[in-house]
Amino acid sequence: MPLVFIKNIDNDTRLGLWKIADELHTDEVCPQMVCNELKQKCARRQTETVAVYALLHAITGRTDLVIGHNADGKPTIDGYNISISHTIGYASIIISKRKNVAVDIEYRNNRVFRIVDKFLTKQEQNMLKELIKTSNPSSPQTNIASQTDCYDTQTALLLCWCAKETLYKYFSEEKLMFNEMQTKLKTISSEGSFENFNLKRGTLKDIMYMQNEKFVLTYTL
């Protein structure tokens, strides 16, 4: 079953995860206007879109909703606030009628090591290095970016990457730069939360997460 889960975050907010597969056709879950548009898209884009609409239907029970985008590129649907993310193999949606929401998902990969300096300051990298050293004393005591064989380091970096992507989406109208966000990951477990800051406006947001051997997922509301 492609549906991995639907989680009720609170009475107003639902989070869903879908495993992308080629089992559905566009006309089974997508509104007709979306089906027409998808004919011009590549096969990968079609599969991702079908997964998103299948998950949207599973969460809301509706097949008439059409996903649009506002001027900031943020997805929109009638009657809900929505955030969407997809990565290789998975699609995720979070929706709420009253709350602003954001979600991000990333499959496990080592690309994150190559872009450490892009999204983390030296201070943030040093904080992660101390966290990993404390949680796993046998981990290599080298530069974060070179610890490609350390599972804990990969997890920490992916959590921070997804958290900043989530914060960017949450404050989409501000178009935050990576150095205008600060992440403070203090522990790593299968599920949890940690503080993240919008430095531009001095706002703190708790980012919730779940992670396993396949992916890392973060969200906020």
Regions found by a protein language model. Give the residues of each.
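Charged/polar low-complexity intrinsically disordered segments
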Residues: Q141-T142, Q147, Q154
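Core catalytic alpha/beta fold that binds nucleotide/phospho-ligands
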Residues: M1-N136, C150-L221
